Amino acid sequence: VEAQANATVYDGGVFIASCDKSMPAMLMSIGRLKDMSAIVVTGGVMEAHTLPKKYVVNDPACAINDLLTLEQIGKIDAWEKTSVIPNEQQDYYKLKACPSCGACAFLGTASTLQIMAEALGLMLPGTALMPATAPELKQAAYDAGVQVMKLVAEGIKAKDIVTMKSFENAIMVHAAISGSTNATMHLPAIAHEFGFEIDADTFDRMHRGAHYLLNIRPSGDWPAQYFYYAGGVPRVMEENKSMLHLDVMPVTGKTLGENLEALKKNGFYEREDIIHSFDNAKGTDGSIAILKGNLAPEGSVIKHTACPKNMFHATLRAKPFDSEEECISAVLNKQVQPGDAIFIRYDGPRGSGMPEMFYTGAALCADPKLASR
């Protein structure tokens, strides 16, 4: 992207991305191209699949409700290895877990970074996490093209939009949505390209006392496709505006405060099923914390909103493994018991590049005895 833009001497561009790696990469590219006008358009978020009643699993330890989303497939994969459910049922889940195009339908890295792009001011208001199949997405893309030409005409560059205040706003929105812990790596990298420095401790400091509002999986009940219809990023910012810099300028060319006021007047958001109000927050201490101690002297990150309260203080037996594959095998072979604390070594950013530990958690959830503890 950067090479193409520099080779053709663009005055402005519309940047399209959706997923875990492409969205932060696109935002980093904009940081390097900050002397041109830029708007980001999402490729959209995937739909959830509505399960027929016979495929709903009501076991509280390993529930699969009537809205199937991709993050549940790891659990189903572990069930397959232990023959918990019939093959025909497993095949059905796998076939239907991605029923449409778009980013995964839960608040993982992809959804979080789409929201961060809008919180930084680089998307048109309300367009992050639009459903990939929604007809409004085509209109949003067209509007972005029109707006970027206005930015070019007015001489408004990416560097005029993305400031240190923008990053502080994004971190406050991250707290409100219980965003992915991977943002603690991606946002500092994006900030660096724009000429600013933030670190994990910045997240920890700003999350303290922040209100957590979003009822979206994995820290809530609903698939990510409903976020847009509930008011999206503007609704989160409106509820949280007492903690934001309202004088920043997004790609609309107006201040954030002016944008929120305009949306509030037109009735863009109403109910609280998906996005809670500031006064009725799901929590009031942000959504992640940076933990330091003898296990991680330089720091580690936890999304405490997705962690059972009884695990905040616990005495457990250490069960270390040298790879995720070893760990999954031990879980499936009943070598991990309630009261064990799993440690997987050599899979951090300096080891194997910090891959997702997705299937380990899924294997634990697939064992009712472990999932209920």
Model-derived segments and their meaning:
Residues V1:
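N-terminal cofactor/phosphate-binding cores enriched in small/glycine residues
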Residues M23, S29-D35, G43-A371:
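Catalytic or ion-coupling anion/metal-binding cores of large enzyme and transporter domains
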Residues Q4-M26, A38-V41:
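A short, small-residue-rich loop immediately preceding and capping a beta-strand
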